[in-house]
Regions:
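A contiguous loop/helix-start segment that scaffolds small-molecule binding in enzyme catalytic cores
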Residues: 91-154
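Generic secondary-structure signature for well-ordered alpha-helical cores
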Residues: 10, 14-17, 49, 68-71, ...
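Alpha-helical scaffold segments in soluble metabolic enzymes
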Residues: 11-14, 61, 65, 89, ...
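Generic beta-sheet signal
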Residues: 20-24, 77, 95-100
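Class I S-adenosyl-L-methionine
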Residues: 1-48, 135-139, 147-148, 152-153
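Electropositive phosphate-/nucleotide-binding environments in soluble metabolic enzymes
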Residues: 2-9, 33, 56, 84, ...
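Class I SAM-dependent methyltransferase SAM-binding "motif I" and its flanking Rossmann-like core
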Residues: 31-93, 140
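General beta-strand structural signal in soluble alpha/beta enzymes
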Residues: 24-26, 52-55, 99, 124
């Protein structure tokens, strides 16, 4: 991936050196788990000015598509980019957990969530904001990369 980030940064800086304005379009918000950050660091480290304009995060888009709120009052919202061994401990402290890129590890996620004795509602969204967006109850098992699962503990 580093070669792609370096290539993108090189292309952008070439255009900037030509006096052009350049935009980097990304899905979601550029400050949250985005390729933008890797490219922007490379450009900024070369002395160029980088402006970041916020977008709608994919996980808040997913919540809106599912018609659910992520947090109210003093609820703790956990947002993680993937399923791994750290998640079990983190879930204990969350009132709502948002787990991104879940389809490849949905069985592990389901096992971890089911270990928690609290009542819960599980909603998954795949390809949020796209023409083939899907929202459904339960865990994402269809293998789509842009899968997010939201767990609301009660």
């Amino acid at each position: 991936l580093k070669s792609y980030w370096n290539g993108a940064a090189q292309l952008i800086t070439q255009k900037l050196d030509e006096g052009l304005d350049v935009s980097f379009i990304t899905l979601g918000d550029p400050s949250i788990y985005s390729t933008f950050s890797y490219v922007a660091h490379r450009i900024g480290n070369q002395g160029y000015c980088v402006e970041m304009i916020p977008g709608i995060t994919s996980f808040t888009g997913c919540a809106a598509s599912a018609g659910i709120t992520l947090g109210e009052k003093d609820e703790i919202i956990l947002v993680v980019p993937k399923v791994d061994e750290r998640l079990e401990e983190l879930l204990k402290h969350a009132d709502t957990a948002v787990v991104m890129k879940t389809s490849r590890h949905s069985l592990m996620l389901e096992e971890l969530v089911c270990k928690d004795p609290r009542d819960k509602k599980v909603v998954s969204v795949q390809n949020c904001g796209m023409d083939d967006e899907e929202v459904f109850e339960g865990f994402a098992k269809k293998g789509k990369y842009l899968s997010t699962t939201i767990v609301k503990f009660k």
